[in-house]
Structure formats: C-alpha cells, structure tokens
C-alpha cells in the first residue's frame, strides 16, 4: 500500500469516527407531556414500615405491606388530560398509586407486550411500581380525564424523569 492510500484510509477513518461521535452524541428528545400536572401536597415522610393483615367482607385473606428505608418525599399530584393528551414517556424513582377520577386513562408501560396499554375508567386505580418502569398515560377518550397520584420518592430525587419511548413498543 502506498503512502497516499494509507493517508486516504487514515483520513477516512478519522472522518468516520468524527461523524460517529457527532451522530451518537446528539441529544435525543423525550416525548413531552401535554397533560397538565399540579402538585397539591408535598411533604417529607419518615421511614415507614406497615404490615396489615385482615379479611375481605367475603372472608378472603387480605394483606398490605408498605416499607421505606429512608426519608421519602411524598406527593399528591393532580393530572388533567384533554382528549388526546398524554404524560409523555417517563419514569419515577419510587412507587405511585394512581386514581382515575373522571374519564378514562390508558397506561402504556414498557413491561407490556408492545406497550399496548391497559385502560382504566373513572373510579378505578392502578399501581406504578417506579424504578425502571417506563410508562405513558394517555387520554384516548373523547372527554376530559383527571387522575390523582400519591407518590413516594426517595428524598431529593426528581419526582418525574422524562424518557424516550421504549424500543420494544413497536416491534
């Protein structure tokens, strides 16, 4: 290989590496929220350990466990969705209990097959485990929807972390 060929290969490799760095380091935008969120209450919650065992009205066993091993930031959040609005893809570092107050909400989550979603009507509730769970809430209905979320977040952590749509959603 002559000197000119080696120089061309070196320049080509350098350009390829530079273009690769520019392409791979360009910012990727998360899907923005179009719903309106309002924090109704924020409070510091001491470490808690609650374990309750009881029975349902039909005599079936029932149990609940809530444990935090550090101070938490507790939130009560109201989310309002016009038809077609969503939270955008995001996660939370701690669990959330979501109550659907009016309308209906579809929860698309990364652990669902192709993120197909589960729809919840007014009067129902569901749990978001937090951590690595990436999800998006969507009002796919024709009327406004409202949710109330009760969240436990490790103290000092952001309440919401914007994410990209998971790659398994459209396989």
Predicted regions span which residues?
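Short, surface-exposed binding/anchoring microloops in extracellular/periplasmic proteins
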Residues: 58-61, 68-93, 97
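Glycine- and acidic-residue-biased ligand/ion/polar-headgroup-sensing regions
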Residues: 92-113, 122-124
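Ligand-binding loop in jelly-roll beta-barrel domains
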Residues: 121, 130-158
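Short beta-strand His + acidic residue motifs that chelate non-heme Fe in jelly-roll/DSBH
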Residues: 89, 107-108, 116, 128, ...
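Extracellular/periplasmic catalytic domains that process cell-envelope and extracellular macromolecules
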Residues: 68-71, 91, 99, 118-119, ...
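Conserved hydrophobic/aromatic beta-strand scaffold that supports enzyme active sites
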Residues: 76-78, 97, 117, 125-127, ...
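A short, N-terminal "cap"/entry segment at the start of jelly-roll beta-barrel domains
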Residues: 4-8, 19-73, 116-118, 163-171
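Short acidic-glycine-tyrosine-enriched beta hairpin
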Residues: 70-71, 81, 110-132
């Amino acid at each position: 290989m002559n000197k000119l060929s080696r120089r061309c290969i070196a320049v080509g490799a350098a350009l390829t590496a530079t273009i690769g760095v520019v392409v791979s380091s360009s910012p990727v935008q998360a899907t923005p929220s179009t719903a309106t969120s309002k924090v109704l209450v924020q409070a510091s919650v001491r470490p808690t350990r609650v374990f309750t065992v009881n029975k349902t009205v039909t005599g079936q066993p029932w149990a609940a466990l809530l444990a935090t091993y550090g101070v938490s930031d507790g939130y009560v959040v109201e989310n309002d969705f016009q038809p077609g609005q969503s939270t955008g893809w995001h996660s939370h570092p701690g669990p959330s209990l979501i109550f659907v107050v009016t309308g209906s909400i579809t929860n698309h989550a990364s652990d669902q097959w192709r993120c197909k979603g589960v729809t919840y009507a007014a009067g129902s509730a569901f749990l978001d485990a937090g951590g690595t769970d990436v999800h998006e809430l969507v009002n796919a209905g024709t009327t406004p929807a409202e949710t109330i979320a009760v969240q436990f977040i490790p103290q000092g952590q952001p309440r919401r972390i914007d994410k990209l749509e998971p790659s398994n959603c459209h396989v």
